[in-house]
Amino acid sequence: MAKLYVVGIGPGGREHMTFKAVDVIKSCDGIVGYTPYIKYLEGLVEGKEVFSTGMKGEIERCKKAIEMVKEGKNTAIISTGDAGLYGMAGPILELAGDIDVEIVPGVTSAFSAASELGAPIMRDSASISLSDLLTPWEVIEDSLEKAAEADFVIAIYNPKSKGRKDNLEKALEIISRYRKGTTPVGIVQDSGRANTKMEITTLDSVDCDTVNMLCVLIIGNSNTYIIGNKIITPRGYNIL
């Protein structure tokens, strides 16, 4: 029987894909994904059956991938970053029934952004999406409150969109109840891609007007500091 692979392709760009992800995509007969993400597979999908949709087509893509497997085609459904974090792994497993599914991990945007900023995620951390399309805002607020109170480094995904202009401001206000205004914040747009933009600032100086849905924010904990053009969250090693 054919197999369904749920593949995390990293933040974007062939150089950030794992060898496993590349091998799986090359071996599959069918590829399913969000239309803008298919372009990251240039050189890997020629001659294959490719199915893509736009925004809000996640379940349609999952059902199509399962259908292709049932037709006897080894199929890969792709997610940027890691498919198990805000990706396709969950809905595929919920829908797959008895078909053979393998999850192929990828580099998630928070860790890609962290590598560009320095070493801001060296200790306990929390990843929180500000998108309230699938999660009620009250739940997101509660997550922000608890992560900030616990002094986790916080990686914020989906900080802003045309329909969610105020969520980032609300999130920063919640975090500011537990963090000093001088807490380092890294903002990375298009992490891991050719047009990456990066800014290192502080919690009380974040310009929300410059942040968009392509950004990841990493907000330090009480020990995080800036040295030169890097952010560091020390783990506790005796360096001296």
Model-derived regions: residue spans:
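Class I S-adenosyl-L-methionine
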Residues: 1-104, 207
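A contiguous loop/helix-start segment that scaffolds small-molecule binding in enzyme catalytic cores
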Residues: 6, 75, 149-240
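Fold-independent oxyanion-binding glycine-rich loops
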Residues: 9-11, 33-36, 53-55, 80-82, ...
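Short gly/ser/thr-rich secondary-structure transition/capping motifs
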Residues: 10-16, 134-137, 199-201
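Short gly/pro/ser/thr-enriched loop/turn and capping motifs at secondary-structure boundaries
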Residues: 38-40, 58-59, 108-112, 133-136, ...
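A polyampholytic, Gly/Pro-enriched intrinsically disordered region
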Residues: 73-78, 121-132, 204-213
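Class I SAM-dependent methyltransferase SAM-binding "motif I" and its flanking Rossmann-like core
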Residues: 87-150
